[in-house]
Each structure stands twice: as C-alpha cells, then as structure tokens.
Design a protein with these regions (language model features):
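C-terminal non-catalytic regions of proteins with extracellular/luminal or membrane-system context
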Residues: 2-173
Length: 173
C-alpha cells in the first residue's frame, strides 16, 4: 500500500525545484488533513461516510504528518504541526495538507467541482504563509479530480495525493 501511495502521487507544480525537500530544515506542517487518517482514507473506511473517526481508530496507520515528521526528524530537521498554519518561529518552508471531507455515494455528489467553493479556508492558509515569504508545498487529498486553480496558484509546489489511506509515510518517502 505504501508503494502504491508513492507511485500514485502527481506533481502538478514545482517552482524553483522546491521538491524534493531538504528535511534538515525547520518545516511547518499545516492544514486540516495533515494529521487526519480518516480524511486521508475517505469514505467507506471504518464508517460508511468515513466521518467521525479518530487516528486511533486506524491501528498501524500513519498520518501524513507522522510520516513527514519521521523523515524530517531522522534528517536532523524540525517538524512543527499547526493545522491553522500559525507559528511562533518562522519556518524555512511550509507543507499544507488539505482536501475533501470523506464521503460515500450520494453524499459526495456536487453540482460544481470547485474545491471549498463557499469557504476558502485552505486557500487562506496558503496565502497567509506566502505573504510572509514562506515557500509553500501543497498536498491535496481527494478521491476525484477537483478544480483547485486558486490553491495551485498560491503554492510553490503542488502534489495531488489522492486518498493515501493508512500509508501517510508514502507521501514522505
């Protein structure tokens, strides 16, 4: 499963060769999907809609944050988790992990494929970090193609990670 995650990542943008990262850096890991195995697993995981799950409900699973932290720590870097993107010491770069809420069947029906159409909270985090001259890598979690032009334009690097399930470490690899 971890190898499948590695091989299914789609790099949509990589300005100034920001990726691969230098994990010895001070890295902020932000976004509501960074440490959320339920969100990275999608619908039909534990519960029908894949909602109201905790990381502890997935024994042996690794969140994207946990996978990144392992890589960063082993390289002598520092990983700081902040779902809202706030920090006390300016990071060298930020990885923002965001995406769709889990869904199954009709609950996932949309009349428009624009991501966060009426509430651009993820875009706000990206723009706030960019305004502070922090390079931003976006990791987008989704079970289907979505219109993310605004988020793509607000990022220095952008990775479509689809639904990595329990193997968040595959994104860090």
């Amino acid at each position: 499963a971890r190898q499948a995650v590695q091989e299914s990542l789609v790099l949509l943008k990589n300005n100034n060769h920001l990726l691969p990262l230098y994990p010895s850096s001070n890295i902020l890991i932000a976004g509501d999907a960074a440490d959320n195995i339920g969100k990275q697993s999608g619908g039909w995981s534990i519960t029908w809609q894949g909602t109201n799950n905790q990381n502890a409900d997935f024994p042996g699973a690794t969140s994207i944050y946990a996978g990144l932290k392992t890589q960063i720590d082993s390289a002598g870097g520092n990983a700081i988790l902040s779902p809202t993107g706030e920090f006390t010491s300016k990071p060298d770069l930020a990885i923002v992990v965001f995406g769709e809420e889990p869904y199954a069947e009709g609950h996932g029906d949309k009349d428009n494929l624009e991501f966060e159409r009426n509430n651009k909270r993820s875009l706000k985090i990206l723009k706030t970090l960019k305004q502070q001259n922090i390079p931003v890598v976006s990791v987008f979690i989704s079970g289907r193609p979505m219109w993310v032009n605004s988020e793509l334009n607000a990022s220095d690097a952008f990775v479509a990670a689809w639904l990595p399930g329990t193997e968040g470490q595959g994104i860090a690899d």
